[in-house]
């Protein structure tokens, strides 16, 4: 029987929907008519003997395909399902991008932050990305976005062009920003992660579900990040109203975080959901990767929902 490994932890302006990354797939779905090393036991499950607060889970909790991991509030260990391996993560990459921007340029409640002025080269880059079918938001030379607006464009409609803008603004160059992404990953214990770009477009950006849980946990400690990913939509100066690709938001206890999808990564979703388990309100922070389906965004979302339903039913 496949089981769980427990890992200790410290601590629509877009022409395409989220995470296409230049490869065909359908638009984000709307599921609702209304407005997420140890020793082996006899069962074959792995357990970490230095922590007793994480329960051993039956294999039926986990998605049948791809990989997944999660942690519940009150626990110090990540529950890790089978098939963990470094794999493309598509736009889930943007969790780390946003985390680094907010780490380097913190925002408090009510603050919009510095202003970023978009250039002709940013517009040319956007046109190139649009031609490749990437997820972008429309921009114009001279357009001004606050840091908060840029993060909203990054995280809601999943704009690859804004990921590039933020990377250069934060670190001076994309290459330097990617170096900072990898340094942050190492500091968080994300040992099976390698970032090569700030948007997740490149298939060489790889990670595991367990590693991504670590950065999601850190990002969700930042109130501005948590607030942005809980928004169903936002309005940008040129792009206008853009929708969050997370259509589970506000349903079944899901409060964010980030979708991702392409043909290499499949359907991916980094999420947080709040459910009542054993009479107690419990926060579940998790990630599913590599979910199959013709509609990859839907596959990631529904893979996460099904897993959370099973967790809550244990």
What kind of feature is each model-predicted range?
Residues 1-15:
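Secretory targeting and sorting signals
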Residues 17-78, 173-314:
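Penicillin-recognizing serine hydrolase domain
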Residues 69-87, 99-107:
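Export/targeting segments at the very N-terminus of extracytoplasmic proteins
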Residues 89-116, 212:
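Active-site SXXK
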Residues 99-107, 168-171, 217-218, 309:
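Short glycine/serine- and small hydrophobic-enriched flexible loop segments
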Residues 107-137, 230-239:
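Short, glycine/proline-biased beta-turn/loop segments that scaffold the active-site neighborhood
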Residues 124-164, 241-257, 261, 276:
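Conserved catalytic neighborhood of penicillin-recognizing serine enzymes
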């Amino acid at each position: 029987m496949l089981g769980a490994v427990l890992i200790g932890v410290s601590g629509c302006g877009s022409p395409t929907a989220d995470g296409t990354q230049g490869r065909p797939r359908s638009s984000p779905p709307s599921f609702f008519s209304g407005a997420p090393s140890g020793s082996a036991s006899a069962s074959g499950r792995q357990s970490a003997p230095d922590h007793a607060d994480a329960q051993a889970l039956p294999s039926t909790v986990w998605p049948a395909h791809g990989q997944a991991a999660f942690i519940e509030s009150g626990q110090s260990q990540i529950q890790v399902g089978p098939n963990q391996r470094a794999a493309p993560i598509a736009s889930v990459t943007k969790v780390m991008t946003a985390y680094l921007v907010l780490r380097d340029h913190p925002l408090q409640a009510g603050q919009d932050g510095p202003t970023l002025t978009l250039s002709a080269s940013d517009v040319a880059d956007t046109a190139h990305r649009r031609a490749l079918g990437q997820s972008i938001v429309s921009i114009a030379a001279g357009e001004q976005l606050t840091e908060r607006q840029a993060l909203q464009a990054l995280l809601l409609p999943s704009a690859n062009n804004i990921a590039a803008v933020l990377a250069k603004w934060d670190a001076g160059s994309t290459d330097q920003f990617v170096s900072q992404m990898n340094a942050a990953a190492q500091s968080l214990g994300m040992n099976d992660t390698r970032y090569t770009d700030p948007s997740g477009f490149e298939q060489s950006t790889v990670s595991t579900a367990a590693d991504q849980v670590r950065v999601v946990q850190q990002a969700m400690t930042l109130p501005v990040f948590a607030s942005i990913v809980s928004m169903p939509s936002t309005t940008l100066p040129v792009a206008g109203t853009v929708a969050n690709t997370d259509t589970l938001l506000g349903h079944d206890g899901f409060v964010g975080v980030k979708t991702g999808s392409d043909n290499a990564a499949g359907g991916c979703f980094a999420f947080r959901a709040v459910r009542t388990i054993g009479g107690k309100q419990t926060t579940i922070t998790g990630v599913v990767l590599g979910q199959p389906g013709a509609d990859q965004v839907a596959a990631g979302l529904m893979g996460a929902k099904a897993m959370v339903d099973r967790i809550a039913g244990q």
